[in-house]
Amino acid sequence: GGCINHGQPCDGDKNDCQCCRDNGYCNCDGIFGLKWNCKC
């Protein structure tokens, strides 16, 4: 368990986004609804 730290990869799902410690969301590159390179 545990939360994902700032700068670590995440999958962009709600649980990951709520669990990012420092900024509270996942930032993803993406287009047409596809996401990649997601980081907290």
From Swiss-Prot:
Tissue: Expressed by the venom gland.
Cysteine pairs bridged by disulfides in the record: 3-20, 10-26, 19-40, 28-38
Domain comment quoted from the record: The presence of a 'disulfide through disulfide knot' structurally defines this protein as a knottin.
Species name: Ctenus ornatus
Annotated compartments: Secreted
GO molecular function, one term: toxin activity
Family, as annotated: Belongs to the neurotoxin 04 (omega-agtx) family. 03 (type II/III omega-agtx) subfamily.
Domain of life: Eukaryota
Keyword Disulfide bond: yes
InterPro entries reported for this sequence: Toxin_34
Function: Not toxic to mice by intracerebroventricular injection.
Keywords: Disulfide bond, Knottin, Secreted
Protein's name according to its UniProt entry: U4-ctenitoxin-Co1c
Gene Ontology CC entries for this record: extracellular region
